[in-house]
Amino acid sequence: MTDYSKATDGTKVIHDDPWLEPYKEVIKRRHNQVKNTIQKLEESEGSLLKFSQGYEYFGFNVTKDGVNYREWLPSAHEVYLVGDFNQWNKTSHPLERDNYGRWSIFIPNNSNGECAIPHGSKIKIYLKLANGNFDYRIPAWIKRVEQTKENPVFDGVFWNPSKQYVFKNKSPMKPTELRIYEAHVGMSSELPEISTYSKFKDTVLPMVKELGYNCIQLMAVMEHAYYASFGYQVTNFFAISSRFGTPEELKEMIDKAHEMGLLVFLDVVHSHASKNVLDGLNQLDGTDHHYFHSGGRGNHELWDSRLFNYGNWEVMRFLLSNLRFYVDEYHFDGFRFDGVTSMIYTHHGLSPACSYDDYFGGAVDEDALNYLTLANVMLHTLNPSIVTIAEEVTGLATLCRPFSEGGGDFDYRLAMGIPDKWIELVKEKKDEDWNMGTIAHMLSNRRYKEKNIAYAESHDQSLVGDKTLAFWLMDKEMYTNMSVTTEETPIIDRGMSLHKMIRLITSSLGGDGYLNFMGNEFGHPEWVDFPREGNNNSLHHARRRWDLYRNPLLRYKQLRDFDIAMNKAEQEFRWLSSDFAYISLKHEDDKIIVFERASLIFIFNFHPSKSFSDYRIGSGVPGKFINVLDSDRKEFGGHVRIGKDNYHYTEDKPWHDRKYSLLIYIPSRTCLVLKKVD
């Protein structure tokens, strides 16, 4: 039998999973493709890290003598730089072409030493396309674009402020337990408006800190022409969204987050790009195969977007440099890679692909997998503390194992099956039909040594056509029965109870990190719907109702206080970085789940009506236990049926394959956490 424990050819992952052995040649081939690419980069570009600094060569780069502008446009016949600086003269500033399809121009300073292109002025390229026609385009590496109300097509903007923001704070140390707050700057205001980086800095960051999260994951930062795309139809990859403010204001916001001890992750979209031609990458040089695959392979029919050719040298440079740019320029601490499933399969995840034959079969786009691994290796070489998260739904084996062992080098994957299962349960199943084994399995089923970020709901579950978990649970009664001055109705009682239980069991059993979408911590009602023609361009559902939790007469504050207590308990006991939980009980009739993790005992009673006194549960260790958190406390909207200060003593009586056991009272629809104190 082969010993893979010391393998250096990419097959070390087989040591922990013998089921991978039949696919060892595929694993080796993929590993070698990455190694060979890195070697080629070292020979032709200096190194992978130097290759990722493309933004220092391409695009606009200001020197003491003037401005260099370079662009890769292999099929263009003529290229001219035009803008306010030359009164939009179409021929006064021609670019020169080299043998690799790279065009360049140097614009010297004015005679007085000032930059010839004024800061904030509009700028574009005018080029003779592959078909011989002339047209305007936005430079691919542009760092600023802006729209007007009259014209939704972006204009390029030359960004060169006299005073650039200087960071004052270093990034915090990477925590061993990630508690992620997913946020969208534009919809972070409680007013029906598009919010800003500055307002987010002043209002949302303090809330995130108070809630006990240690990381913010920012959506929709990369520029996108269509606001209602939620930021997932990117037009300009090096430009941050101008709707929310300036690059300097985003830097100040991130710097403030770092001062507060918060990491900041970017939701990066490299899985596809907007089809926009006039202000996007599409047909930049007049061809459909410039940055993308040609023909049908270059189009995502469901998303109506373009698909990158990850095997192209300059596409790799562009995307790797894009990641490096956000680290170097904006000090982002990590990335959530959007749409990884779509990237790594030629069917884009639209066909079932959840077996080893699928993971190592012919439907995998190995160029895309090669790019993703290179991206992770580059980022982790640049700074080992950078965190990378894959939005990947099929559970592709080895994706989150180190590259040195044969993996894709991601730090985490999103546990995307968990929120789908919760929504399925609350939508389709009666409480009496909830299966405890199914719940325990969906939360604990993850690959060995591949970390998961668990979540009960993210932005995906809140989009129009769906609704938040709280709204599924309580629906229209949230409009009329959330007041603490009126008697709690059965629907509100059930919804409040299950909302707390679902979040705690997801955090404590579901993974190695935890994520929450902004506002859902207090049971945000309704759904998210960005302004569009179908809703008369309304911002009513593209905001966060922070006023609901601030109102002491409403029950939202109780849900929020439970979330704070849950995060505080996690920070103290660190269950997210602890070993897998030991599940000692999944009782279908009693609707009870019991498990141990981080030296704590977690007890959940999902039964809609039955409470149990002197209920025996197992424990792996003997001693005296006390309640450190329960969902039935008054401050959390509970019924105060569980004593906070009562001690529970184990007995030398084996129970459910545990050496010891203890008796507890478990009211219906409650959860509690016991800590050993002696």
UniProtKB/Swiss-Prot annotation:
EC number(s): the record gives: 2.4.1.18
Query: What is any one GO biological process for this UniProt entry?
Result: glycogen biosynthetic process
Task: Identify the domain of life.
Answer: Eukaryota
Q: Enumerate the active-site residues.
A: D338 (nucleophile), E391 (proton donor)
Q: Where is this site: Transition state stabilizer?
A: D460
Claim: Glycosyltransferase is one of the keywords in the record: yes
Entry GO terms, CC: cytoplasm
- CDD domains per the UniProt record, alphabetical: AmyAc_bac_euk_BE, E_set_GBE_euk_N
Q: Which SMART domains match?
A: Aamy
Q: Where does (1,4-alpha-D-glucosyl)n bind?
A: W88, K124
Gene3D superfamilies of this UniProt entry? Glycosidases, Golgi alpha-mannosidase II, Immunoglobulins
InterPro entries found in the cross-reference section: A-amylase/branching_C (IPR006048), Branching_enzy (IPR037439), Glyco_hydro_13_cat_dom (IPR006047), Glyco_hydro_13_N (IPR004193), Glyco_hydro_b (IPR013780), Glycoside_hydrolase_SF (IPR017853), Ig-like_fold (IPR013783), Ig_E-set (IPR014756)
Name the pathway it acts in: Glycan biosynthesis; glycogen biosynthesis
Q: Which residues cross the membrane?
A: none
Entry keyword annotation includes Transferase: yes
The record's GO molecular-function terms, alphabetically, read: 1,4-alpha-glucan branching enzyme activity; cation binding; hydrolase activity, hydrolyzing O-glycosyl compounds
The alphabetized UniProt keywords are: Glycogen biosynthesis, Glycosyltransferase, Transferase
Subunit structure as annotated in this protein's UniProt entry: Monomer.
The entry's family comment says: Belongs to the glycosyl hydrolase 13 family. GlgB subfamily.
- In Swiss-Prot or TrEMBL terms, this protein is called 1,4-alpha-glucan-branching enzyme
| Organism for this UniProt entry | Dictyostelium discoideum (Social amoeba)
Q: Which gene encodes it?
A: glgB
